[in-house]
C-alpha cells in the first residue's frame, strides 16, 4: 500500500510528534478493495477509462455484470469476448451473472434478475465454459425478497428462486468456480434463512452484502452489527461461507463529498475480507427499471468520478495520496459540536491559495476560523495539512461544496464574518463544462447569499470577483512598446481600468462570475446585506500551486524550476498587474473594518500601474532567479484573453487607506524562494541564454 508522503516536513512545517496518537497516518485496512462498474455493450472507451482509474487507485478487483440479455443479443458473445480480453491481466474480475440489463441500477433496484429462471443455469454454464480460467469466483443473482421479476406465479417465486440458485451454484462448483451469493440485505434476513432451509447456503462459498448506509430510509445498525447478524444466520445453518461487502456506496447528487468519503472509510473498516465500492463513475445511462417512477436521481451519482471522468474529492485524494491520505483528511475535518455558541470567520474555498493565507493570518491573531472547501483543486489538501499543523485548536474544517445548500446554511449559522473564495476559476473549464461553471460560481454564490439572509443578523461578506467581468477590453487602443502592450491613452497608462467601466461578460466564466458579482451587490442594495465585491487582478504568493488556468505566476515558476516548457498563448506581450498575497490580506481586513461605509460597492483590487509585468518580462525575471531562461512554446490566443488589464485601485485606496507594499521583483523572488524551500527541488542550472525561446 502506498504511503502518504510527509509533505509537512517537506514544506518546512513543524514535524509531527511521534508520541501523538494522531500522528500515525497508517490505518489498518484488512479488506481487499474492489470497484463495481457496469459496462454497456460496445463501450470499449468506458472500459479503458475505468481500467486507468483503477490503476490510479491501485485497485486490482473489479465487479462487473455479464447479462444474458446482452450475451444472447446480436454481437453479444463478441462484445463479452472483447470485454474479457480488455480486463484479462489488468484486474481480477468478479462477474455478476444476471438475466437482466447491464445498466447499473443503484440502491433503488432490488437486485433481482429478470426473466425465466429456467434459463439461468444454462447461461451460467455457458459463461464459465467460454471464459475458462478468466475468474475464480462467480456471483449469482441474489437479492431475494420474495417479489418481482420472475414469470412464475407469486406463491411459487420463493421456491423457484431457491431451486434456481442451488442448481446454478452446483453447476459453477462442478466447473471449479467458487460461488458468491450476492445481494443479501442485512435488514431482511428472513430470505437468507429461507435459502438456508432450501440448502442453497451449502453450495455457496461467500455471502455478499448489498447495503447503502446513510441513504434516506436506510435503517442501518452499523457494519459490525449487520455482519454479525448475517454470520449468526450462517452459523445456525451450519454454513462456513465467508462474508463480503459486494455492493455499497454513497451518492453525491447533493454534493455530499465528505459523506461519501466517510461512508467509504467506514466500509473499509468493516470486519469482512473484501469490499466492492459502487462505482467508478457516475452513470451516463438512464436506469432501466420496470417501474421508471421508482428511479432515484441519486442512482446516477454514485461514482468516484463524474460521468465525464472528473475527480470527486474521494477519488482525487485516494489517487494522489492513497488510503492514508483519506484517513488523514478525515481526521483534519472537524465539525462543531451541536449546539455550539462558538463564533468564527467563515472562509469558503478556504483551503485554496488565498483562503489558506487569510486563515493563517486570522488564526495567528487568535481568531476562530471555519474553512469550507470541496478540495477540487489539486494540491490544496497540503494547505489544509499546514493549517492543521499550525492551528489545530481554533481551526474548523468543513469538507463541503458551495453547491450544497444545506451545508452552506449550517456553516453560516455561527459565522461572524465571511470571505467567499469558492469558485470555478478556469476560463478553459468554463468553455468545456459551462453548466458546472454556472452551478459553482453563480448558484453557489446565491446559496451563500440566501444563507446569510436567512440568518437574520448582519454577517459582513467580502466576495472575490474577477477583472474578467470587464470583458476582452477590445475597445482599449493598445500599442506595442518593447516586450509589452500599453494603452495609447495616457490616463489609462497612469491609472489603469476603473470601476466606472461598463461590464461586458466574455466566456462562460465571465458570465458566471459576473452574475455572482451583481447578485452580491444587489443583495446589499435590496436585502440590506453587508457586502462588498473585489474585482481582482492577478494574485500570487506562497501556498500557490499554479496551473495554466489560474495561478499563472506560480505555474510559470514551477514549470521553469522543473525545466519543463511553458505554454505562452499569443505573443507574450499581454500585461497584467500583480498583487502579492500579503497586500491582498491587508485589503480584506480593511474591508471588514470599513464595511459600514463601503457596503454595496465594487472595487478593483490589484497591484495597479506600479506593479505590472508582461509575460515576456516575467519569463526574463524567472531566468534571472533560476539562472536559466525558461523553455517556452507558443499557442494561438485563447477566447476572451485580455491583451491588457491593469487595475485602477484609487477608489479603494481613498475609501480605506489601503496601499500595496510589495513590488513585482520582490514578490516573485519571495514566491520562488518559497517554492524552492517547500515545494520543488531546483534542478541543475543550464547556461543562461540571451533571449526567451520562441
Predicted segment positions?
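NAD(P)-dependent short-chain dehydrogenase/reductase
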Residues: 473-495, 508, 514, 518-592, ...
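Hydrophobic faces of well-ordered beta-strands that scaffold small-molecule active sites
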Residues: 31-37, 62-64, 93-97, 138-140, ...
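Active-site cleft segment of glycoside hydrolase catalytic domains centered on the general acid/base Glu
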Residues: 44-46, 74-78, 105-206, 210-232, ...
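N-terminal substrate-binding region of glycoside hydrolase catalytic domains
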Residues: 20-126, 132, 139, 145
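C-terminal substrate-binding subdomain of Rossmann-fold SDR/epimerase-dehydratase oxidoreductases
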Residues: 358, 364, 400, 558-694
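N-terminal Rossmann-like NAD(P)+-binding domain of SDR-like oxidoreductases, especially those catalyzing
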Residues: 333-537
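Aromatic-rich peripheral "rim/lid" segments of glycoside hydrolase catalytic domains that contact
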Residues: 255-259, 276-334
Amino acid at each position: 500500500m502506498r504511503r502518504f508522503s510527509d509533505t509537512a516536513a517537506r514544506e518546512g512545517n513543524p514535524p509531527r510528534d511521534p508520541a501523538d496518537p494522531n500522528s500515525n497516518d497508517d490505518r489498518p485496512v484488512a479488506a481487499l478493495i474492489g470497484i463495481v462498474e457496469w459496462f454497456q455493450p460496445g463501450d470499449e472507451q468506458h472500459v479503458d477509462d475505468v481500467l486507468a482509474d483503477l490503476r490510479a487507485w491501485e485497485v486490482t478487483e473489479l465487479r462487473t455484470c455479464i447479462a444474458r440479455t446482452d450475451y444472447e443479443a446480436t454481437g453479444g458473445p463478441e462484445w463479452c469476448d472483447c470485454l474479457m480480453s480488455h480486463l484479462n491481466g489488468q484486474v481480477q474480475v468478479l462477474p455478476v451473472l444476471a438475466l437482466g440489463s447491464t445498466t447499473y441500477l443503484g440502491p433503488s433496484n432490488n437486485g433481482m434478475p429478470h426473466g425465466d429462471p429456467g434459463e439461468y443455469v444454462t447461461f451460467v454454464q455457458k459463461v464459465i465454459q467460454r471464459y475458462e480460467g478468466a475468474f475464480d469466483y462467480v456471483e449469482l443473482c441474489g437479492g431475494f425478497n420474495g417479489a418481482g421479476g420472475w414469470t412464475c406465479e407469486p406463491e411459487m417465486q420463493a421456491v423457484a428462486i431457491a431451486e434456481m440458485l442451488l442448481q446454478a451454484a452446483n453447476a459453477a462448483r462442478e466447473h471449479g468456480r467458487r460461488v458468491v451469493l450476492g445481494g443479501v440485505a442485512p435488514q431482511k434476513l428472513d430470505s437468507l434463512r429461507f435459502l438456508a432451509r432450501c440448502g442453497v447456503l451449502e453450495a455457496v462459498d461467500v455471502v455478499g452484502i448489498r447495503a447503502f448506509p446513510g441513504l434516506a430510509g436506510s435503517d442501518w445498525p452499523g457494519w459490525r452489527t449487520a455482519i454479525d447478524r448475517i454470520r449468526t444466520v450462517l452459523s445456525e445453518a451450519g454454513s462456513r461461507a465467508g462474508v463480503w461487502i459486494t455492493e455499497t456506496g454513497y451518492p453525491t447528487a447533493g454534493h455530499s463529498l465528505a459523506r461519501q468519503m466517510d461512508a467509504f472509510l467506514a466500509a473499509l473498516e468493516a470486519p469482512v475480507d473484501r469490499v466492492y465500492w459502487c462505482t467508478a463513475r457516475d452513470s451516463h445511462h438512464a436506469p432501466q427499471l420496470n417501474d421508471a417512477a421508482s428511479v432515484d436521481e441519486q442512482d446516477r451519482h454514485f461514482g468516484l468520478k463524474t460521468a465525464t471522468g472528473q475527480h470527486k474529492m474521494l477519488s482525487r485524494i485516494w489517487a494522489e495520496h492513497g488510503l492514508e491520505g483519506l484517513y488523514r483528511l478525515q481526521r483534519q475535518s472537524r465539525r462543531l459540536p451541536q449546539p455550539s455558541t462558538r463564533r468564527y470567520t467563515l472562509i469558503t474555498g478556504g483551503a485554496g491559495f488565498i483562503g489558506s493565507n487569510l486563515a493563517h493570518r486570522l488564526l495567528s491573531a487568535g481568531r476562530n476560523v471555519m474553512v469550507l472547501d470541496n478540495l477540487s483543486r489539486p494540491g490544496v489538501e497540503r494547505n489544509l495539512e499546514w493549517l492543521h499543523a499550525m492551528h489545530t485548536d481554533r481551526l474548523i474544517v468543513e469538507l463541503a461544496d458551495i453547491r450544497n445548500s444545506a451545508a452552506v446554511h449550517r456553516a453560516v449559522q455561527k459565522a461572524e464574518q465571511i470571505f467567499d473564495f469558492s469558485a470555478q476559476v478556469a476560463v478553459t473549464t468554463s468553455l468545456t463544462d459551462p453548466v458546472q461553471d454556472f452551478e459553482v460560481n453563480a448558484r453557489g454564490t446565491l446559496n451563500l447569499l440566501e444563507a446569510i439572509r436567512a440568518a437574520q443578523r448582519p454577517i459582513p461578506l467580502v466576495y472575490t470577483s474577477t477583472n474578467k467581468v470587464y470583458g476582452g477590453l477590445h475597445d482599449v487602443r493598445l500599442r506595442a512598446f518593447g516586450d509589452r502592450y500599453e494603452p495609447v491613452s495616457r490616463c489609462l497608462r497612469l491609472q489603469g481600468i476603473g470601476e466606472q467601466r461598463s461590464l461586458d461578460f466574455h466566456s462562460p466564466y465571465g458570465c458566471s462570475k459576473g452574475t455572482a458579482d451583481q447578485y452580491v451587490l444587489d443583495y446589499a442594495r435590496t436585502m440590506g446585506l453587508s457586502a462588498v465585491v473585489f474585482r481582482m487582478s492577478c494574485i500570487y504568493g506562497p501556498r500557490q500551486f499554479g496551473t495554466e488556468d489560474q495561478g499563472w505566476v506560480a505555474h510559470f515558476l514551477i514549470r521553469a524550476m522543473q525545466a519543463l516548457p511553458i505554454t505562452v498563448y499569443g505573443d507574450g506581450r499581454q500585461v497584467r498587474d500583480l498583487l502579492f498575497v500579503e497586500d491582498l490580506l491587508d485589503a480584506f481586513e480593511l474591508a471588514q473594518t470599513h464595511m459600514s461605509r463601503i457596503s454595496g460597492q465594487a472595487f478593483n483590487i490589484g497591484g495597479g500601474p506600479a506593479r505590472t509585468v508582461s509575460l515576456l518580462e516575467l519569463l526574463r525575471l524567472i531566468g534571472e532567479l533560476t539562472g536559466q531562461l525558461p523553455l517556452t512554446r507558443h499557442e494561438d490566443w485563447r477566447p476572451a484573453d485580455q491583451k491588457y488589464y491593469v487595475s485602477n485601485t484609487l477608489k479603494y485606496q481613498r475609501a480605506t487607506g489601503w496601499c500595496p507594499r510589495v513590488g513585482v521583483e520582490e514578490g516573485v523572488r519571495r514566491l520562488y524562494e518559497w517554492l524552492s524551500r517547500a515545494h520543488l527541488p531546483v534542478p541543475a542550472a543550464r547556461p543562461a541564454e540571451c533571449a526567451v525561446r520562441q
